[in-house]
């Protein structure tokens, strides 16, 4: 399986979630199963079945996170030279040429993307158009509303 890029911050967030699932949620669920089992007949024990379902979800998420972390290529933006190029992990401010509105995005891995936090996946159309470009370059992005032209007005290598 190929490696997937991820920022240091993204990897840390996944590790924190994995730790919580293994050492907080897992013991709590095991205790809930034991408590429900003590109530007697398991066939009609809704608490038991709910706890087992929760356990199944928790274990599945643990496996998913372990797989993501094992296939992650963690990129530390602070160790890369700031040469003004847009790369994975950089924070880019762009200006919509037609309207003059400015947008700022951080280019991150697929699991880290969150448009509410202005984090976009490196595989998104905007990020694909920006990566490799430099300050003052113009890029054209295909959007559902048609082709949109942006100008890169700032490139930062910010570590959160």
From Swiss-Prot:
**Biological process, per Gene Ontology:** DNA-templated transcription elongation; regulation of DNA-templated transcription elongation
| Molecular function per GO | DNA binding; RNA polymerase binding
Keyword Translocase included in the entry's annotation: no
List all membrane-crossing ranges: none
The protein's superkingdom reads: Bacteria
**UniProt entry keywords in alphabetical sequence:** Coiled coil, DNA-binding, Transcription, Transcription regulation
Gene source species = Legionella pneumophila (strain Corby)
Q: What's the gene?
A: greA
Which InterPro entries does this entry report, sorted A to Z?
GreA/GreB_C_sf, TF_GreA/GreB_CS, Tscrpt_elong_fac_GreA, Tscrpt_elong_fac_GreA/B, Tscrpt_elong_fac_GreA/B_C, Tscrpt_elong_fac_GreA/B_fam, Tscrpt_elong_fac_GreA/B_N, Tscrpt_elong_fac_GreA/B_N_sf
Q: Which residues form a coiled coil?
A: 50-70
Where is the organism placed in the taxonomic lineage, from the top?
Answer: Bacteria, Pseudomonadati, Pseudomonadota, Gammaproteobacteria, Legionellales
- Known NCBIfam families for this protein? greA, PRK00226.1-2, PRK00226.1-4, PRK00226.1-5
Similarity annotation:
Belongs to the GreA/GreB family.
Report the HAMAP family cross-referenced here: GreA_GreB
What does this protein's UniProt record list under function?
A: Necessary for efficient RNA polymerase transcription elongation past template-encoded arresting sites. The arresting sites in DNA have the property of trapping a certain fraction of elongating RNA polymerases that pass through, resulting in locked ternary complexes. Cleavage of the nascent transcript by cleavage factors such as GreA or GreB allows the resumption of elongation from the new 3'terminus. GreA releases sequences of 2 to 3 nucleotides.
Q: Which PANTHER family match?
A: TRANSCRIPTION ELONGATION FACTOR GREA
Q: What is this protein called?
A: Transcription elongation factor GreA
């Amino acid at each position: 399986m190929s490696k997937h890029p991820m920022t240091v911050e993204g990897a840390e967030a996944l590790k924190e979630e994995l730790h919580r699932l293994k050492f907080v949620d897992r013991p709590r669920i095991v205790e809930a199963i034991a408590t429900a089992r003590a109530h007697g007949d398991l066939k009609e024990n809704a608490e038991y079945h709910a706890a087992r379902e929760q356990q199944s979800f928790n274990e599945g998420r643990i496996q998913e996170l372990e797989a993501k972390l094992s296939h992650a290529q963690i990129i530390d933006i602070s160790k890369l030279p700031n040469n003004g190029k847009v790369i994975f992990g950089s924070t880019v401010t762009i200006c919509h040429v037609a309207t003059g509105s400015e947008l700022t995005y951080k280019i991150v891995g697929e699991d880290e993307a969150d448009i509410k936090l202005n984090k976009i996946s490196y595989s998104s159309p905007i990020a694909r158009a920006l990566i490799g470009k430099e300050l003052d370059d113009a890029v054209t992005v295909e959007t559902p509303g048609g082709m949109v032209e942006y100008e890169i007005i700032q490139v930062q290598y910010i570590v959160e």
